[in-house]
Amino acid sequence: MAKKGKNYLEAAKQVDATKAYTVEEAIDLVKKVDFAKFDASLEVAYRLNVDPKQADQQIRGAVVLPNGTGKTQRVIVFAQGEQAKQAEAAGADVVGAEDLVEKIQGGWLDFDVAVATPPMMAQVGRLGRVLGPKGLMPNPKTGTVTMDVTKAVNDIKAGQVAYRVDKAGIVHAPIGKVSFDAAKLVENFKAMQDVIIKARPASAKGQYITSLSVSSTFGPGVKVDVASF
């Protein structure tokens, strides 16, 4: 494990590691102990009682946070014809088809989210080895494979967050910036919480959310009481 820096250790002293805080208390504490010299993201980490190896327990989706993420997302869209025009009108940063596929094959990756229409997926599929490991591959579950490119671009620009359970059964997701008003962060948290709960697989047994913490980008995690979830 990497050695923690002095600032981290000082921040960690202010967090009671034996206590599970309310969401409101946890967010206030994360804001208080954040030591970054930039506007850090505030992130949640859910540990879920699921087996990601099972197809029906691979939790994945997207949610539009009511107060956004505080980050401007660069969106590209793979589309042709009318959908390409709609994507441009909606404010997509780059729109293309085969030319865009070739551009990415050439090493260009200056974007945060990729959207594709279903007819384009045969070509976009060639980028799987490039986009897949980076979490940039369009996927129907996150609303990024769709004919309604206008809605997709609007949602992403408005603060949509994609989430996915990892191999350890943990979902990491940003819910805003530390500079956000605490009440807005709580609203964003509740929006994320709702979709995580609704995504519970029917086959999941026992307590679904086994632990939950919030933290800033480099700050210590603050445990949240999950007894009511």
Curated annotation (Swiss-Prot):
Sorted alphabetically, the Gene Ontology BP terms of this entry are: regulation of translation; translation
The cross-references to Gene3D superfamilies, in alphabetical order and at most eight, read: 3.30.190.20, 3.40.50.790
Q: Which GO terms describe its cellular component?
A: large ribosomal subunit
The UniProt keywords, alphabetically, are:
Repressor, Ribonucleoprotein, Ribosomal protein, RNA-binding, rRNA-binding, Translation regulation, tRNA-binding
Under the GO molecular function aspect, what terms does this record hold? rRNA binding; structural constituent of ribosome; tRNA binding
Q: Which family does it belong to?
A: Belongs to the universal ribosomal protein uL1 family.
Q: How does it assemble?
A: Part of the 50S ribosomal subunit.
Role: Binds directly to 23S rRNA. The L1 stalk is quite mobile in the ribosome, and is involved in E site tRNA release.
Looking up NCBIfam families in the UniProt record yields:
rplA_bact
Q: What is this protein called?
A: Large ribosomal subunit protein uL1
Which organism is this protein's natural source? Latilactobacillus sakei subsp. sakei (strain 23K)
